[in-house]
UniProtKB/Swiss-Prot annotation:
GO CC aspect terms: nucleus
GO MF annotations in UniProt: DNA-binding transcription factor activity; sequence-specific DNA binding
Record-linked InterPro entries: EFG1/Phd1/StuA, HTH_APSES_sf, KilA/APSES_HTH, Tscrpt_reg_HTH_APSES-type
Biased composition (Polar residues): 19-28, 238-251, 319-333, 351-364
Protein encoded by which gene: stuA
DNA bind region: 145-166
Species: Dothistroma septosporum (strain NZE10 / CBS 128990) (Red band needle blight fungus)
Induction: Expression is positively regulated by veA.
Protein name: Cell pattern formation-associated protein stuA
Entry's family note: Belongs to the EFG1/PHD1/stuA family.
Biased composition (Low complexity): 334-350, 465-479
Amino acid sequence: MNQPQPYMDQHAPAPPPASNMTQYSNYGAPQPLQPATHGYGAPTYPQYGQYGQSMPPMQAGHPVSAPMQGQMVNSLPLPTMSAPQQSGGTQQFQQSFDTTGQIAPHGMKPRVTATLWEDEGSLCFQVEANGVCVARREDNHMINGTKLLNVAGMTRGRRDGILKSEKTRHVVKIGPMHLKGVWIPFDRALDFANKEKITELLYPLFVHNIGALLYHPTNQARQSIGNATMAARRPESSQEYMRTPQGTQAPALTHHHSMSNPINASMPPQPHSIAPHPASGRPQLDRAHTFPTPPASASSMPMTNGNMPNSYEYGSAGAVNSASTPPSNSQGMPQYQTSQPPYTQSYSTPGSYSQPQYTHQQPGVQRFGNIHSSPDGVKTEMGPPARAGAENDHPDHKVGGYGGQQDAEGEHEGEYTHTSASYGARRLSYNYKPNPAPGPLHQDSSHVSPEMTHSPHQNGSGRATPRTTNPYTGYNNTPQRQNQLPSSNLNYVMSSDARAGAPNGQEYAQQAYQPAPQYPAMNGIKRGREDDDQVDPYGRPSSALGEHKRQRTDPGAMSARPISQPHSIKAGGAVRR
């Protein structure tokens, strides 16, 4: 009874029949005819009987009258002559059957999504109806006619016939499923929707300002297409623009706040371009990229190590510059010297040749020489201190006193074992041994080649066998050799292997096959030989026994030889077993 109340007020002269005859107020009947309308009011009710539960004439207090009157007013499509009085009814009629698609149906919420059509370079608004997604382009407002007619439940043949007859159409055969089909102009799509009575189902599709209805969970107050398209096209880039100033300026303040002013004033752009996001969980990248920055000012190098340890490897060199060293470094460096006094005393003598050894390998690091003599020099994160750590593992090997000649031996003994052709000029320093080796495993004279001392067959070949590459102990004259396993500290001094503290068996095996990479080692004991078919460069006659022994103990060498070429026995003689 709430809906037709304004119409009852307009026809107030006959209140009792007005409650029953309100559905006829839309006809604009004159006032004298209202008593007569009560006569034929009863026979007209049966056609609306499907809406009610009983057939008797309706009265004001009947419970069925309210839904009946509401439905009858909504279902009467007849035009009226009294336009001023029927303004409310005509507005309700236009809302229920809207042909423009601009007015939302009663109780329907607009649901629009937007995607970027990369192939066409346009934003597409999508509306779903009857399980079909109908898309509309933002640039030219064309609508996918194939999906539009699918919403109406049209057959494929009829749909294709209608779309083929369109003059302006754009056929899309690739891309997502909801974008494939025949695209037609906006007005033609609206005509098809009105003919098929699906305009209300596709309500937000034909709204002119459809971008304002774009569904966004966090911001539903958007009122312009520009904002909607910008949010849809750049959902992440806009956030990056917002957080980029926070990510670029912050590292310049936090990463370099401990440095002196010359570096901060001269190098501000470098942290901006290299470390845009300090909170990304990878701070080591910042330090690695800004690694060359601290040497620009020598006075600022210790500052980086004092506040940010291990951020710059140059910071550990602050101990050399005693004048500019802060308390953190000055307290840290003597701590190494006093914590283990026996090591520092034993290292005082060999420090004279350990520093030239670093000069050979890395000429630019001479200023770090004083640090490397400390037993904990490995923790300075520099390249050379790995060798210092290796020296610490065998401190008592060096007390016996080494000459400069043994330093040269350590340089070249790895080369002699494998690249024998390049060792011709250095052979004198290798063979020169005035004293017999006191090692427990070698009772022979040290002037004999090591391969003859370690091999069960006393052959005179100048090649090293897999048995001889393991313990190179025949040319050491340290008095401590009797109490230890055969190992040489020369390898630890001159080698560039970071695993210098490994046992001597593994250490020598690693050096054994490094110069010959084309024959990878199988177990760490065997090694590939690249000089099988070469004549001895030292001019010594090779024994037949040694050659046959290599054929049996090294299957890799057998596979390396050509099968068609027989391997002749050098220096003649029958093979003895």
